[in-house]
């Protein structure tokens, strides 16, 4: 549309990030972080977790130990491809095997003697089956030689029965910043977690809480359940750091507001009073006494010295190999944050802030489960050894315990939505469309219990920390997930790092920090603490912090540390800390670098000329200071300019205040929002609704839908959209299509297309317009004897079955047809019966409203016969089906009109779809009109000057004015037809045409907006929604219809449906629908004295309550539903008396007649 000028350099750089980067191993950018995460797990982390050598049991002062060693971990890929797995209905799993050795070590004078107890060399093909993540082009990390299918982006797991599963990324519960909480007025807590580094296995977790009550400052304690003593936080800091209380006072008071300094003095004075209250106070003796008291309280089997070492050595596991003095200074820095947060809570990251959280990707899920299940496996072996020693006196292990690691069940539960046993479930989805396949693996959500904690019934807002890193449009608009599940923006990704890379990076950073003068990094009293993954390593001179951070960022961008995704955050605002983050699970995205008030993109004149031939990794290598990868914590505490345009309008002094500059607005949207057009030109709610509808659009899948027995709806004749964004193109959503182009007219049509109603042309449907095919899986399990039984009486339900008892291929199934033979037989205990065998049909019937063709049948013979049938049905648009544009103009088919009924233009062209014109004004979707204008302009000039097809770029969010798009359309029409008059040119630009009435052949008085647009068909189909039926299955207890369409049932008729049918006649309709439809009803007798239901004894109805009191009951017959009788009977059985009372009226037959005066009127 416009030439690539210098002002668009930021947009071109952003596009470079989205496209594939083979030099960096990036072949599909949207899901690259998921592929890397899973690849790290299965190629590296799984070996680290399963390779174990540790003691199980120890005896005789640790001179005898039972050891376990797991080695020779091998992971083997499957022999077949993902498509073969789908066809066979198998899961696509890798096989992991290992060797377990259990032996006894005895320490003797000669040395250590080893006695073998048990050994198992795992070669079982079902030992550990790990679901394989299918990546771009059907690749997997174990076998990259599988044949490539370029349009298969993957990102899925194939579960059994060929169901492709994807899941969202959960936010970790553990926060990287302590959680501040106000317990009650003047009472506060500061909770934080400490997790051991990734190289320490098994992972150790500790959770601590610092409590502070203004009325009891002496009780300002730190505690941890069963893992640490409860001790005064100031005294613990003094004990660990070996400094005086005055040192701690100065450290806490430095650069603090007066109110915080006052509280610091009060806390230090309270600690002094505590020490003065103890005679001959000694800090070591004080801590030792607390440890001894805790040892007695816990009744620990360890000696006091072992107990103390275990408690203090494991204090703060994330600083496992750090001296106690640094641990003490770390506690002082935490206390400093705590005291500041009491007075300035709003300046501290709250618990919902993404600054505090890491994110679990696919690889991390499997890693966590593998770690937990391995500990359970080792625990089971230990318990089995102890039981055998106790019962038999021998150290032995049952082979069953060795061969059941338990990982298979955990991984299977993961794909069904169950992450951990204690954490509830998280969201997983079957893979249906391209949009879901990309959006769901990039969704980030909180744990289910975090949803409950976060006040799920209150309105949740878009958290400020999610700005730029999350899509502000693609969020749930209603329900408990509002604000709790978000979509990553197109530039955002999640970091991954190997354990070896982590250790090397940590070592390089520490060496860089220690390269500074020793005194400058030892300012522990008034300096800025430097932490690496929350582990304190130094304290920097306050006069050097700016130079340090600037130099660190420059070295990082130049590749000095070997990792471009390191995050360095300078926390000012009196909290005074430099935080360096290198771990996995951090949100990162690129930003344009501002250095000393200059946009580094502008000071590289060679960049523009070379940009077209470079990849993103090339830019990072050859122009390292132009772009920086920034994590969400660094972004939050940095000054970031909103756009390049605003930055260039500032003065030089204002520019120096900024550290980074953002890319254009289109890069802040997610991939679903990028499939929309011009959401910034519409009203706000249209973007949220548009994202929800785009994910419901029916697309064309690339996988083999005819052989794969799975549910799905697929577009038969998809078209690539003409108006697209760069993200839509690079993600291959555009190439794989999710709609068709149709010609629309914005006008009213005989009052039929009111509100959301649309008119659709009959001939358009007959030509395959927006035609779909529905693939549906039917599965039944039949006992083997029932399947082998022969039917005695010919049944119409078996008319589509072959002699083998299975439905025929290409048979058209109707409602009531059986898909496999299932005949139950029973023997009557009657000696006089000639044939005491009776049989009846119990087969599962086809229940859909529409006919379907049988495409494929699979049978598995075990103890039961498992039959799976795939049916296909072409489904053209019918009344009630839903459609939408990419601007959230959803419509429902109100009328299917013949071509002769529709208005036409001067060329005889009739619209495919007629949409109510008032919807544009009510919903304020101006970008829908722009899309029609741009699509029509493309049809005039579809090729550029080089003869190449060029789609029109209309990003979801953009700063381009509407006039620029109108100018583009004008140039297209002037190029193709330069002789147009001004009026004709204006009509073509704005897609205004004169239409003719089909009945009178006269033109309409006003022009009609008439042009092409990309139209989507939604998954909401009329025949799938039909749940009100007059016959079907019923429950055994209450004999009402089953609830749920999938179970062959219906819906219960409620008050809203009742209100809709009042016009039909309230009394008759309610009686028919609520009572007379098919629900069993019966006559019952009610006692008018006590209101009980009469009992029937020897065919005589009597009231038990009244008969015991020798009363003469009056029984009245009423007509009620069976479920009402069941309800009253069950309530009576639970001791609740429900009395049925009657309305008392005088009998109308015996009412006295009105007196009639028969006198002549003239005598009155």
From Swiss-Prot:
Question: Which PROSITE patterns does its entry note?
Answer: RNA_POL_BETA (PS01166)
- EC number, UniProt record: 2.7.7.6
Give the record's GO CC terms: DNA-directed RNA polymerase complex; virion component
What Gene Ontology biological process does one annotation of this record name? DNA-templated transcription
Q: Which GO molecular function entries does the Swiss-Prot or TrEMBL record give?
A: DNA binding; DNA-directed RNA polymerase activity; metal ion binding; ribonucleoside binding
* Protein's UniProt keywords contain Membrane: no
Spell out the reaction equation it catalyses.
Answer: RNA(n) + a ribonucleoside 5'-triphosphate = RNA(n+1) + diphosphate
InterPro entries attached to this UniProt entry: DNA-dir_RNA_pol_su2 (IPR015712), DNA-dir_RNAP_su2_dom (IPR007120), DNA-dir_RNAP_su2_hyb_sf (IPR037033), RNA_pol_132_poxvirus (IPR024390), RNA_pol_bsu_CS (IPR007121), RNA_pol_Rpb2_3 (IPR007645), RNA_pol_Rpb2_5 (IPR007647), RNA_pol_Rpb2_7 (IPR007641)
Task: Look up the signal peptide feature and give its range.
Answer: none
Q: Alphabetically list the UniProt keywords.
A: DNA-directed RNA polymerase, Metal-binding, Nucleotidyltransferase, Phosphoprotein, Transcription, Transferase, Virion
Q: Which Pfam families match?
A: RNA_pol_Rpb2_3, RNA_pol_Rpb2_5, RNA_pol_Rpb2_6, RNA_pol_Rpb2_7, rpo132
* Localization of this protein: Virion
The keyword Nucleotidyltransferase is annotated on this UniProt entry: yes
Per the entry, what this protein does is: Part of the DNA-dependent RNA polymerase which catalyzes the transcription of viral DNA into RNA using the four ribonucleoside triphosphates as substrates. Responsible for the transcription of early, intermediate and late genes. DNA-dependent RNA polymerase associates with the early transcription factor (ETF), itself composed of OPG118 and OPG133, thereby allowing the early genes transcription. Late transcription, and probably also intermediate transcription, require newly synthesized RNA polymerase.
- Family assignment? Belongs to the RNA polymerase beta chain family.
The record describes its quaternary structure and partners as:
The DNA-dependent RNA polymerase used for intermediate and late genes expression consists of eight subunits 147 kDa, 133 kDa, 35 kDa, 30 kDa, 22 kDa, 19 kDa, 18 kDa and 7 kDa totalling more than 500 kDa in mass. The same holoenzyme, with the addition of the transcription-specificity factor RAP94, is used for early gene expression.
Fetch the PANTHER family from UniProt: DNA-DIRECTED RNA POLYMERASE I SUBUNIT 2
What is the protein named?
A: DNA-directed RNA polymerase
Species source reads: Monkeypox virus
Question: Mind giving the lineage of the organism this protein is from?
Answer: Viruses, Varidnaviria, Bamfordvirae, Nucleocytoviricota, Pokkesviricetes
């Amino acid at each position: 549309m416009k030439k690539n000028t210098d002002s668009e350099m930021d947009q071109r750089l952003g596009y470079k990030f989205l496209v594939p980067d083979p030099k960096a191993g990036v072949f599909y950018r949207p899901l690259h972080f998921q592929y890397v995460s899973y690849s790290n797990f299965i190629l590296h982390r799984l070996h680290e977790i399963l390779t174990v050598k540790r003691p199980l049991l120890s005896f005789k002062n640790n001179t005898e130990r039972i050891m376990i060693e797991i080695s020779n971990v091998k992971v083997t890929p499957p022999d077949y491809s993902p498509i073969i797995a789908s066809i066979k209905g198998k899961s696509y799993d890798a096989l992991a095997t290992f060797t377990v050795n259990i032996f006894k070590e005895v320490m003797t004078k000669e040395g250590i003697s080893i006695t073998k107890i048990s050994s198992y060399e795992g070669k079982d093909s079902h030992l550990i089956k790990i679901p394989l993540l299918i990546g771009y082009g059907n690749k997997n990390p174990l076998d990259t030689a599988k044949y490539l299918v370029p349009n298969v982006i993957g990102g899925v797991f194939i579960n059994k029965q060929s169901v492709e599963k994807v899941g969202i990324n959960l936010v970790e519960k553990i926060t990287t910043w302590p959680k501040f909480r106000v317990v009650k007025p003047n009472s506060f807590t500061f909770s934080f977690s400490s997790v051991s580094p990734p190289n320490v296995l098994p992972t150790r977790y500790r959770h601590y809480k610092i409590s502070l009550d203004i009325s009891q400052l002496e009780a300002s304690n730190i505690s941890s359940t069963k893992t640490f003593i409860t001790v005064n936080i100031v005294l613990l800091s003094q004990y660990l750091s070996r400094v005086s209380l005055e040192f701690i006072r100065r450290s806490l008071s430095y650069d603090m507001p007066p109110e915080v300094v006052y509280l610091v003095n009060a806390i230090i004075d309270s600690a002094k009073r505590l020490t003065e209250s103890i005679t001959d106070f000694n800090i070591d003796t004080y801590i030792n006494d607390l440890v001894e008291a805790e040892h007695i309280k816990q009744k620990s089997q360890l000696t006091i010295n072992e107990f103390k070492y275990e408690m203090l050595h494991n204090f703060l596991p994330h600083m496992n190999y750090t001296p106690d003095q640094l641990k003490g200074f770390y506690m002082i820095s935490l206390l400093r944050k705590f005291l500041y947060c009491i007075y300035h809570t709003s300046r501290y990251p709250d618990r919902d802030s993404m600054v505090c959280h890491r994110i679990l990707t696919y690889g991390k899920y499997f890693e966590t489960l593998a770690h937990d299940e391995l500990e359970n496996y080792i625990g089971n072996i230990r318990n089995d050894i102890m039981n055998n020693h106790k019962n038999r006196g021998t150290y032995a292990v049952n082979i069953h315990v060795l061969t059941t690691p338990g990982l298979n069940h955990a991984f299977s539960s993961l794909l069904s939505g169950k992450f951990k046993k204690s954490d509830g479930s998280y969201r997983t989805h079957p893979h249906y469309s391209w949009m879901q396949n990309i959006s769901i693996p990039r969704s980030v959500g909180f744990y289910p219990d975090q949803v409950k904690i976060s006040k799920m019934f209150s309105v949740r807002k878009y958290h400020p920390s999610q700005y730029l890193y999350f899509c502000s449009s693609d969020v749930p608009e209603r329900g408990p997930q509002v604000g709790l599940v978000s979509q990553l923006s197109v530039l955002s990704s999640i970091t991954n790092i190997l354990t070896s890379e982590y250790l090397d990076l940590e070592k390089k950073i520490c060496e860089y920090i220690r390269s500074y003068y020793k005194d400058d990094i030892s300012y522990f009293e008034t300096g800025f603490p430097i932490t690496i993954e929350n582990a304190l390593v130094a304290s920097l001179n306050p006069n050097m912090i700016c130079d340090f951070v600037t130099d660190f960022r420059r070295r990082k961008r130049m590749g000095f540390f070997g990792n471009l995704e390191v995050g360095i955050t300078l926390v000012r605002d009196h909290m005074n800390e430099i935080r360096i983050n290198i771990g996995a699970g951090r949100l990162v995205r690129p930003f344009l670098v501002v250095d000393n008030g200059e946009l580094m993109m502008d000071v590289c004149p060679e960049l523009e000329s070379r940009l077209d031939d470079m990849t993103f990794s090339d830019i990072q290598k050859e122009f390292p200071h132009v772009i920086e990868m920034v994590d969400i914590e660094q972004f939050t505490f940095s000054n970031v300019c909103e756009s390049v345009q605003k930055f260039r309008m500032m003065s030089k002094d204002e520019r120096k205040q900024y550290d980074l500059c953002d890319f254009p607005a289109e890069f802040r949207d997610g991939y679903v929002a990028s499939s929309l057009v011009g959401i910034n030109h519409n009203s706000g709610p249209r973007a949220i609704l548009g994202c929800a509808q785009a994910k419901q659009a029916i697309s064309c899948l690339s996988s083999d839908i005819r052989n794969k027995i799975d549910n799905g709806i697929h577009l038969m004749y998809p078209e690539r959209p003409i108006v697209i964004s760069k993200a839509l193109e690079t993600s291959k959503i555009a190439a794989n299509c999710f709609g068709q182009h149709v010609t629309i007219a914005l006008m009213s049509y005989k009052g039929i297309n009111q509100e959301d109603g649309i008119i659709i042309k009959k001939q358009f449907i007959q030509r395959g317009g927006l035609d779909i095919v529905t693939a549906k899986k039917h599965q039944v399990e039949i006992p083997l004897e029932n399947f082998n039984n022969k039917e005695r009486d010919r049944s119409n339900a078996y008319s589509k079955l072959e002699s083998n008892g299975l439905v025929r291929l290409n048979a058209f199934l109707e409602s009531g047809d059986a898909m496999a033979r299932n005949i139950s037989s029973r023997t009557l205990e009657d000696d006089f019966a000639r044939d005491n065998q009776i049989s009846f049909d119990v087969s599962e019937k086809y229940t859909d409203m529409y006919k379907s063709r049988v495409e494929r049948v699979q049978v598995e013979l075990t103890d039961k016969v498992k039959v799976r049938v795939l049916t296909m049905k072409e489904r053209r648009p019918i009344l009630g089906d839903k459609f939408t544009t990419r601007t959230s103009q959803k419509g429902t088919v109100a009328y299917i009109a013949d071509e002769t009924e529709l208005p036409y233009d001067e060329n005889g062209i009739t619209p495919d779809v007629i949409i109510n014109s008032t919807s544009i004004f009510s919903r304020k979707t101006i970008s829908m009109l722009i899309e029609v204008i741009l699509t029509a302009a493309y049809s005039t000039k579809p090729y550029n000057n080089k003869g190449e097809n060029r789609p029109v770029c209309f990003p979801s969010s953009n700063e381009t004015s509407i006039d620029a798009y109108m100018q583009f359309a004008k140039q297209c029409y002037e190029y193709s037809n330069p002789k147009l008059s001004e009026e004709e040119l204006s009509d073509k630009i704005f897609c205004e045409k004169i239409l003719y009435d089909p009945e009178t052949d006269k033109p309409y008085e006003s022009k009609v907006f008439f042009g092409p647009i990309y139209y989507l068909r939604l998954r909401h189909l009329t025949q799938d929604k039909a749940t009100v039926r007059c016959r079907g299955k019923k429950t055994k207890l209450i004999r009402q219809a089953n609830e749920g369409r999938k179970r062959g049932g219906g819906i219960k008729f409620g008050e809203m449906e009742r209100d809709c049918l009042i016009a039909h006649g309230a009394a008759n309709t309610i009686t028919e629908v609520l009572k007379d439809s098919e629900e069993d009803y019966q006559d019952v007798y009610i006692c008018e004295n006590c209101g009980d239901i009469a009992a029937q004894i020897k065919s005589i109805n009597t009231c038990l309550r009244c008969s015991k009191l020798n009363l003469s009951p009056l029984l009245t017959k009423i007509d009620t539903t069976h479920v009402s009788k069941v309800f009253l009977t069950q309530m009576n059985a639970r001791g609740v008396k429900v009395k049925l009372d009657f309305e008392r009226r005088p009998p109308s037959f015996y009412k006295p007649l009105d007196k009639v005066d028969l006198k002549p009127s003239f005598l009155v």
